[in-house]
Amino acid sequence: MPATYTAAQNVPPQTHATDAAPEGLTPEAMRGLSAKFRTSQFHVELRFAPGETFINTKQRRLKINLDAPVFTIGHTLGVKGFLGGDYRYNFTEASIYKRFWMNSWGKIDCYLKGGIQWNQVPYPLLIMPETNLSYIIQDETFELIDNMEFLNDRFASLYVSWDFNGKIFNRIPLLKKLKWREYIGFRCLWGELTDKNNPFLGQNAQSDILMMFPNGCRVMDPKEPYYELSLGIHNIFKLIHVEYVRRLNYNDYPGVHKDGIRFMVRMTF
């Protein structure tokens, strides 16, 4: 059971994400408009992958079988007062990964993950979507969500990618000769911020734990998940992957990136 310790965590100045403060809530009523805090935490994780096989080298162990389902569950306990930790919190997260073979139609990879922050915590300890702020493709991240755009204390995410293995492109002689491969990806995020962690509610005006959200942070509508769709080509020169990503909703905000192009270099044999 590893223990991690953050010596100091800087928190930027706290402001509302909306122009008007809610009734009963003023900046003076909230502690820590600009603050530093420490966290001390213990983390334990269990992983179960029946049928998974490996090759062992002197430096590391490499997976050679990606067909086995992988189940993980972990819990993080923040300890107040231990090594200077300022907050007590409990965060639980679980995930499932599975690959499905579609015969001549290639393969589908599915990754489902969810988590809950059980305690009232300042916003840096809330759940932030795993975002990719670069132009390099990163697995199991959202490509068009900005950093800290959505803050939740419970979430579920789904990543699905379907590699057609040339089933469509092989019908086009030039693409068949080039051995390019097509794929489609879908990403979905459901999130909710419960009342106990919402600093915009008057009932939390006297909280000595909550902090105001920075500008640009938003509260998701639990009735409307976030969606992304991607269309890609890989195996270009057996090396280059290119994909077009489109954000399907939550587009009515200033500065939102509705679409983009991402790249990756990965050797394919």
What are these regions (language model features)?
Residues M1-F269:
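Exposed, low-structure sequence patches enriched in small/polar residues
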